[in-house]
Each structure stands twice: as structure tokens, then as C-alpha cells.
Amino acid sequence: MYDNMSTMVYIKEDKLEKLTQDEIISKTKQVIQGLEALKNEHNSILQSLLETLKCLKKDDESNLVEEKSNMIRKSLEMLELGLSEAQVMMALSNHLNAVESEKQKLRAQVRRLCQENQWLRDELANTQQKLQKSEQSVAQLEEEKKHLEFMNQLKKYDDDISPSEDKDTDSTKEPLDDLFPNDEDDPGQGIQQQHSSAAAAAQQGDYEIPARLRTLHNLVIQYASQGRYEVAVPLCKQALEDLEKTSGHDHPDVATMLNILALVYRDQNKYKDAANLLNDALAIREKTLGKDHPAVAATLNNLAVLYGKRGKYKEAEPLCKRALEIREKVLGKDHPDVAKQLNNLALLCQNQGKYEEVEYYYQRALEIYQTKLGPDDPNVAKTKNNLASCYLKQGKFKQAETLYKEILTRAHEREFGSVDDENKPIWMHAEEREECKGKQKDGTSFGEYGGWYKACKVDSPTVTTTLKNLGALYRRQGKFEAAETLEEAAMRSRKQGLDNVHKQRVAEVLNDPENMEKRRSRESLNVDVVKYESGPDGGEEVSMSVEWNGMRKMKLGLVK
């Protein structure tokens, strides 16, 4: 039997040379099952033989049974040995899989290190180029010095002639108003930011952020999105130290680097440290670019946002007002970026209960948006919604209701044409259902008038919020049927919007998996509820989106 088993094992080993690892594991599992079955069978036979041996007397027949029992025991030992070896093979397979997984992780780390190495190589190449240019400049200056000394010896008699000449060794560079573009901004915002940057460049000198700082910014964002602040912070500090050594502390590039580091601290909720860095960047930009530069306005705005996150609205307000003055001076009083700043200032005033100022700022921003961007621009609806929320805070329900109806009517007209008896916006249907609730229980089917919002893409969040707010206002007035109609529409609109966003994100991931590295961390601070979102210059853009349920509770979103 042992010879036969050895032969079988030899045959199996000969076959293993041609099997894949998965096939080996599968065969091993089958062998384990077979050996377990044989072991159970041998145990049963052994028990039977032992019971037979007890019944027999000591004679030749009992000796034969005892010999069989010994053979069964040897077979059981061999079966247990085979099972042990099979289990060792399975454990080895699991270990190899773990090793392979670890190897994949190490490969990912190697790729990351290669990226960092490439960045360092680029930095080294850039430094070498600068060194070469500096050496050439030194050699040229030495030649010029020798020439001037020779000419001076020839013209010693002429004391009135001076060989010195004035040279401008360095021109002040101007950082962009918007440090790095925000990929999550909507197209309208992107166009406005480009226009703002172009205007600032035309007036102030067309400053370009160095490519190495953009590369560093992307690396820092990637690390911060993964929560690896222990890598991102030292990387920023080292780059800042290098810039200060090469360019000095009072240089626009240093201010840019301070903004990047402030962004990292902001993501860690270290608002005090971030504010200190922005104050330093503000001082540098005021000194190197002038106090009325667009970059100074951007830094003032970002600093105001950080104060807002800490609830220091009184300290934030003068900073925001100064940023507004600069933008009005540089861009003109009717520029869309001025309207953004007005929205931010209105938000800060609203948190302090200065409702008259809030109304003024929102009305002025609304006028700019309607004049410059047109009545169908998303910012128009958003600003109307913000102004309506201000009215609600003061109990001016009629004015708020009028604005909400204007938003819904405009959205309806944009999708379905002018309003008439056969083409009504949803708030009209809601009020008709309220009037007819006693006469007709079921009312009009939602499907007859509820599909208008499906085509609203840009305005869908604002429209949904408006539906909720107007519904809450109806409920406060006792118009429960109308309120339920609008709330049902808001729920369907929100569900459809979430489905569309989900599909879009899935499509983006399928087309470009690396897009998932984008990180835009967003924090919220409850005042009534204030939500700040990331904006240009590594800082904040602030606007407002307000939801009201009749209990004076608000959700405030972005401050630029």
C-alpha cells in the first residue's frame, strides 16, 4: 500500500509541474476532502475491529484481527500526515497571496516616489539653469568691471563724468487674483474668474505663477486629500524656506507659497495658524504689489472667510469691505466679481443682524448680475433666493413670497415658454389646488405640471431650495395643500438631481479613474448654519443658499 501511495504521489508531483497555482489549490482542496473521508472510514473500521477483538478469545483469529487493526492505525497515521501536508500547502498559498498584495502596495509606493523624484529632478534642473545663468552674469559683470576700471584710468582728468548707470535688477511680479482654478466651479464662475484675472493682468503686469509651484500645489493637494498632512506640511515648509533663501521673504512667490500652506492648515481646521500665514502673505503683497492690487483683495477675502469660520464676524467685515473697495476700483463697480464680493459682505452682515445693509448689498449684487450676465444666469436666481431669506429673517413674508415666485416663474419660462392659461408654473398649480381642495379632493395630477423642473440643470439646487422655502411659507399661511404640492416637487427634483450627479460621477470615474484624486474638503460652522467652500487663491468663495422651514433656520453657503 505504501509503495502504491508513493507511486501516486510521484505521479501527482509530475502533474503539478504543468498546473497553475489556482489549479493546485483546487486539487489540494479536493485531496483534503478525500483524505478526510478516508480518515473517517478508517476510524469506523478500526472501531469495529476493536469491538470484534474484545469479543474474541486469544486464538489465531484474534491475532488476525489485531494485525488488521495495526495496519488500519498505520494507514490513519499516513492519512493524517497527508492532511497535515495539504494544510501546510494551503497556508503557504495564503502566505504567497499576502506577499503578492504587499508587493502591489510597494509598487504603488514606488510609483509615488518616482513622481516625487521627477519633481525633485525638475527642481534640480531649474536650479542648475539658474546657477548657469548666474555664473554667466557674474563673468559678464567681471568683464564689464575690468572695462570700466580701464576707462576710468583713461579719464581720470574728467571728474564730472560718472561711469555708473542705473539698472532695474528686478521687476515686481504680480500674483494672479485667482491662485489656482477650482475645477469644481460651474462654467459661469470659471468664465468670470478668467475675465477677472485677465483684467487684473492687463492693468498690473501679467504675472504668471511658476510651473514648479503649480506642481508642488498639486502634490500638496494630493497628500492632503489622503490625510497625509505629515508629508504635505513639511513639503510646503521646505519649499517656503527655499524660496525665502533664493528670492527673499518679501517676494510674490513667497506669498503664493504662504497661501498654499494656509490651505493645508485650513484643511486641518487650524484656522488660527492659517490666518497668521494669510496676514503674512497680505503684508508681502501690499509691499510688493501695492495696496490696491487684485491679489491683495483676494487675500483680504480669504482672511475674512477664516475669521468667519471662527465666528469673528466683526473682524471679518472690514476686511471684506476693503476687498470690495479694491475690486470696485480695479474692475469697476458693475463687474460680476464685485457682485460676488457684495454677496460675501451681505452674508457677514446677516450674521450680525444688519438686515438693512444686507438688503442693500443683495439688491446691488442682483442688479449687477441682471445687467452684466442676463436674467437667466444662475447667480440671479441664487441672489434672489438670498434676498428672500433676508426678508424672511425680518418677517417680510410678502416680499419673500414675491421673489420665490419670480424664481420659479423664470425657470418655467426658460424651459417651456411664456406663461399663459395653458402653461402655468408650479406655484400657480399649487395655489389652484389649494383653492379647489374642498371641491375636488384628488386635485390635478402631479404629472400634468410637475415635469417642468426636470430640464433645469444649472438652477436645480436653487429651484429645489426655492420650492422648499415657498412651501414652508405656504404652510405658515395655512395653505397646506399648496405646501404639500411644492414639497412633493422639491423631493422629486432633489431625487432626480442626486441620480444625475451619481451617473455623472460614475461616468467620470469610468473615463478617467485618476480624477478621483480631487480633493475639496468642506467644513461647516453653525451660526444659523454657515457653510464655507473652497475657492480661488487656495482660499474661499462664499455665496449663500438658504433653506427656511418657518423656524428662522438658515443654511448659508460660500464667502468670496
Curated annotation (Swiss-Prot):
> The organism's lineage?
Eukaryota, Metazoa, Chordata, Craniata, Vertebrata
Protein name, please?
Kinesin light chain 1
Which organism's genome codes for this protein? Pongo abelii (Sumatran orangutan)
Phosphoserine-modified residues are where?
A: S162, S460, S521, S524
* Annotated PANTHER family: KINESIN LIGHT CHAIN, KINESIN LIGHT CHAIN 1
Assembly, in brief, is: Oligomeric complex composed of two heavy chains and two light chains. Interacts with SPAG9. Interacts with ATCAY; may link mitochondria to KLC1 and regulate mitochondria localization into neuron projections. Interacts (via TPR repeats) with TOR1A; the interaction associates TOR1A with the kinesin oligomeric complex. Interacts with BORCS5. Interacts with MAPK8IP3/JIP3 and NTRK2/TRKB; interaction with NTRK2/TRKB is mediated by MAPK8IP3/JIP3. Interacts with CLSTN1; phosphorylation at Ser-460 inhibits interaction with CLSTN1.
Q: Which residues carry this modification: Phosphotyrosine?
A: Y449
Q: Corresponding gene?
A: KLC1
Q: Where is the composition biased (Low complexity)?
A: 192-203
Q: Is Coiled coil one of the keywords UniProt gives this record? A: yes
- In residue numbers, the region (Disordered) covers 155-203
Q: Name one Pfam family in it.
A: TPR_12
Q: What job does the chain carry out?
A: Kinesin is a microtubule-associated force-producing protein that may play a role in organelle transport. The light chain may function in coupling of cargo to the heavy chain or in the modulation of its ATPase activity.
Q: Which SUPFAM superfamilies match?
A: TPR-like
